[in-house]
């Protein structure tokens, strides 16, 4: 499929730094690629492949700049399932290097990295290829139990706990999660524990609105419908499913269930839009429809006894209208006429909230699902014939079995506040590699966990800067350590030391015990003032930041005393592995504040470098009377 590559553009670029960009495509496919080549004086005989299932082939400046600064050329291929297009692009790149470099080594070192859906591709590449990539950095690892099950349990818990969100958030910010427990009913506490045992990080609930987002669950609906089309019908009709259960949990979840038949009141053709064909207004939709999520619209035949098909479009609950897209089948568009009936329901969406209960993996070791196995060893709930998450993973990774038989060195970067890719899933994959490699494990594998980091690659939103850090520098650090490991035999820092309790990954406390690459920060205040801080009193904040052995030096310390998410840099001397500071501050206004210090370590101890900077946050709540 990817046998013939064609170069379309070959040009010199100046930004983010001088390089050569080669753009091309594979003949007979819709897959294209870009190579970003550093000048010969900067190339060190290696390349990086960045992968993600639905990316385009144009790399962002930060990614290009990092590769160039690391002595590598960057390959970015438009997104596909699996790794084959990326492998073909890598092989093609070798064939043209002599056109750009006078000296090309016999072996060009290759490294592949990608996160979330890209971790499927990265692991697939390392289990199913040899001789293309020498190492890999999978980031925020997805496994054969991740999608869509993580989102199902997360949305179940957030739907039940929504009315207690403020109690949960406050207890986490105060550093005492147990404070929230007395405020939860028996049902709420049970669902909270179900989510915890499934792997939702407890402290991630501080960003409750993020966990409550149903966007991904709705995106993943179509995959489950294709793989397990009878699930929703079974949910609402068969014993053992919440849809037929008479319980408080059923009452809470199903209070958000909608199933009505509406009438098309008006149809307005849209002639000046590339995406939408009609705007249709519905009659007979309840006034509170704005409160219902995951709605689907099915056009019914005459007499409502048959279905013509599902409509796609954009729903506007305030006007009770649908902007119908042009990509709907002609039979649907031609039947959008006044007085025709449309069924409005979210039965599939509601049913998805407990899908994880019916998906106990057939493979051993996925301990987050043990809660759904009874004392007799049998599943508590009916199990589906298809294991949807395993099928999703199989397609995304290019058919790999997640057996751990990696063909090169690997450093996994995983985040402890990740509610999309649960932290314990990386621990599970580590066990697969360890079992398969045996005595070769320590020479080929690392797992680095990072606290105060979430899932997405985008810059941290302003309202979350006191909660999480940007972790781009963490996997940049991993990529550089991987290069040194493969090419020069320099051992990277040891894997993070941690324990798993109730599916929660808990790292060791001290830097010399925790290992990994993230600096640890301890923040406290003078004990004599705790609980008795008066306005105008000077508070001394005591901070210690420690970089793990071999992980670089602390190069920056920034403070936010008032919880305004605005950090001010504070000089502390030369970069060092350990930084101790006592910083005074006066609070003039009574209130509750979250004082936050952000520390940054850089792999080479270079305070001026923008790359391979690893951050962490120290936080303490301050009550001023």
Map each language-model feature to its residues.
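C-terminal His-loop and adjacent cap/lid subdomain of alpha/beta-hydrolase
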Residues: 1-625
